[in-house]
From Swiss-Prot:
NCBIfam families: rplP_bact
Localization, UniProt: Mitochondrion
Organism annotation: Marchantia polymorpha
Protein name: Large ribosomal subunit protein uL16m
Pfam families (alphabetical): Ribosomal_L16
PROSITE patterns linked to this entry: RIBOSOMAL_L16_1, RIBOSOMAL_L16_2
Length: 135
């Protein structure tokens, strides 16, 4: 599971995901990539599920780079608890994703395999994504 060992604060405000990503929109490591087409939040479970789906498709002799990291804690209060009495406990971790941000990079695989893996990962992520290759 991908989440930080320690953070500056235990709990964060919700914040908003809006705008486009200025940097982190070009491929740095692999030949193929998965880019987000909209801004949103991705949980660490979704990132891990997408990574597993991609690696399961490729088997061996392939390289995958995860370019997002879930570093923001999400809190929630237990069921049937009255309002007030402070902010809830940490429930999980999310990554804020902006439009145009690269989520995954792949290398040492064929184009058709990479496209199929991107489709599998898209079902896990919950955001609209775009597959593209290095040019």
């Amino acid at each position: 599971m991908l989440y930080p060992k320690r953070t500056k604060f235990r709990k964060y405000q919700k914040g908003r995901c809006k705008g486009c990503k200025a940097d982190g929109t070009q491929l740095c490591f692999g030949k193929y990539g998965i880019k987000s087409c909209e801004a949103g939040r991705i949980s660490y479970q979704a990132i891990e599920a997408a990574r597993r789906a991609i690696s399961r498709k490729f088997r061996r002799n392939s390289k995958i780079w995860v370019r997002v990291f879930a570093d923001i804690p999400i809190t929630s209060k237990p069921a049937e608890v009255r309002m007030g009495k402070g902010k809830g406990n940490t429930k999980g971790w999310i990554a804020r994703v902006l439009k145009g941000q690269i989520l995954f990079e792949m290398d040492c695989v064929s184009l058709s395999n990479a496209q199929q893996a991107a489709t599998l990962a898209a079902h896990k992520l919950g955001l609209s994504i775009k597959f593209f290759k290095w040019s």
